[in-house]
Amino acid sequence: MLELLYTALLYLIQPLIWIRLWVRGRKAPAYRKRWGERYGFYRHPLKPGGIMLHSVSVGETLAAIPLVRALRHRYPDLPITVTTMTPTGSERVQSAFGKDVQHVYLPYDLPDALNRFLNKVDPKLVLIMETELWPNLIAALHKRKIPLVIANARLSARSAAGYAKLGKFVRRLLRRITLIAAQNEEDGARFVALGAKNNQVTVTGSLKFDISVTPQLAAKAVTLRRQWAPHRPVWIATSTHEGEESVVIAAHQALLQQFPNLLLILVPRHPERFPDAINLVRQAGLSYITRSSGEVPSTSTQVVVGDTMGELMLLYGIADLAFVGGSLVERGGHNPLEAAAHAIPVLMGPHTFNFKDICARLEQASGLITVTDATTLAKEVSSLLTDADYRSFYGRHAVEVLYQNQGALQRLLQLLEPYLPPKTH
């Protein structure tokens, strides 16, 4: 009964979704494009019979990059289709893989749209990153006997409590999933408590630890640092949300009193916020350039606004330390491991529930510092910039946490082998 109500409601609210897409398109025009894909209509043919991977957010897409590369290496003859839901996620997929994978939007969870999509792609295996439990998608895959694996699965206590209210509906949903590869024991236990069978759930660890700085990226970062700031300190604030840029800018203004040549790289989380961030910097009276301009910072440049896509790992490589946003406001924080991979200290606000386990490990190992406002942010950045040994201590411990927790990718690949043809590499 709940399935029918859910589907009927989803059809009824489609006009509201169109309005929302159109409104969001004011700041991000890409939201007004490719609507047909959201209903299973595609301009170009898709190669069937391969692997499909869905990642809803930018963070999940980034975590999936090593997995997709490993699958391409092991199964070069299988087409890989990567689906997302947002233009930002789409841009990340295209910048990471180009034409090496097929990329389209995953249709909304409507039976007819999903059937059109699955008829086109006809995957041998479907991977969903983290926790995207779409009832009609899961039902369609189950009916077609297509294996479904939730990779890098996580389930917060808050989300588990919400799902628990749906009782048998969620239990039936979970039992249609082939395998749940949980990030940790807590996540796995929550899935079992909601109705998944013990033999459906295994703990692999988090794929987010399986990132690395390639020699090519490191060399590019060194070159850019020499061009931008050969003799001045640099800090970076990334994935910032509304309400955080003003805090970062206030901290930077205070820091400039002590470090007059300090350079800030400010990277908002969403492209539609780039103009707002630029306005805030301008209103603060700070000298700035944008990354998209291609300009090189002069000695008087105080801020570089990172308004390009797909360059976050490169920009981390330029910085002496990093603040990771979504954490001073209640967004749950963003991935601190991308900064840790560069062996630089990581600062975050108190709201890190999206990365609770990772942040706890970093903080326990002295790789993460928690700040609460502009004053504490400026104070901690000042301490790190003043003392090179202190800065090195936190950076070294941050990257050690990364290395010590790697291995989830290989464990997951082994679990996927029974559902795929024999690997060729």
From Swiss-Prot:
Q: What pathway is this protein said to act in by its record? A: Glycolipid biosynthesis; KDO(2)-lipid A biosynthesis; KDO(2)-lipid A from CMP-3-deoxy-D-manno-octulosonate and lipid IV(A): step 1/4; Glycolipid biosynthesis; KDO(2)-lipid A biosynthesis; KDO(2)-lipid A from CMP-3-deoxy-D-manno-octulosonate and lipid IV(A): step 2/4; Bacterial outer membrane biogenesis; LPS core biosynthesis
pH behavior is given as: Optimum pH is 7.
**Location relative to the cell:** Cell inner membrane
Activity regulation: Catalytic activity is inhibited by the antibiotic polymixin B and by Re endotoxin.
Asked whether the keyword Electron transport is assigned, the reply is no
GO BP: any one term: lipid A biosynthetic process
- The reaction(s) this protein catalyses: lipid IVA (E. coli) + CMP-3-deoxy-beta-D-manno-octulosonate = alpha-Kdo-(2->6)-lipid IVA (E. coli) + CMP + H(+); alpha-Kdo-(2->6)-lipid IVA (E. coli) + CMP-3-deoxy-beta-D-manno-octulosonate = alpha-Kdo-(2->4)-alpha-Kdo-(2->6)-lipid IVA (E. coli) + CMP + H(+)
Q: How does it sit in the membrane?
A: Single-pass membrane protein
Name the domain of life.
Bacteria
InterPro entries given for it? Glyco_trans_1, Glycos_transf_N, Glycos_transf_N_sf, Kdotransferase
Q: Where are the transmembrane segments?
A: 3-23
Q: What is its main location?
A: membrane
What modifications follow translation? Degraded by the protease FtsH; therefore FtsH regulates the addition of the sugar moiety to the LPS and thus the maturation of the LPS precursor.
Function recorded in the entry: Involved in lipopolysaccharide (LPS) biosynthesis. Catalyzes the transfer of two 3-deoxy-D-manno-octulosonate (Kdo) residues from CMP-Kdo to lipid IV(A), the tetraacyldisaccharide-1,4'-bisphosphate precursor of lipid A.
Tell me the protein family, please: Belongs to the glycosyltransferase group 1 family. Glycosyltransferase 30 subfamily.
Domain free text: The N-terminal half of KdtA is responsible for determining the number of Kdo residues that are transferred to lipid IVA.
The molecule here is called 3-deoxy-D-manno-octulosonic acid transferase
| Species whose genome carries this gene | Escherichia coli (strain K12)
State the organism's lineage. Answer: Bacteria, Pseudomonadati, Pseudomonadota, Gammaproteobacteria, Enterobacterales
Q: Its encoding gene is what?
A: waaA
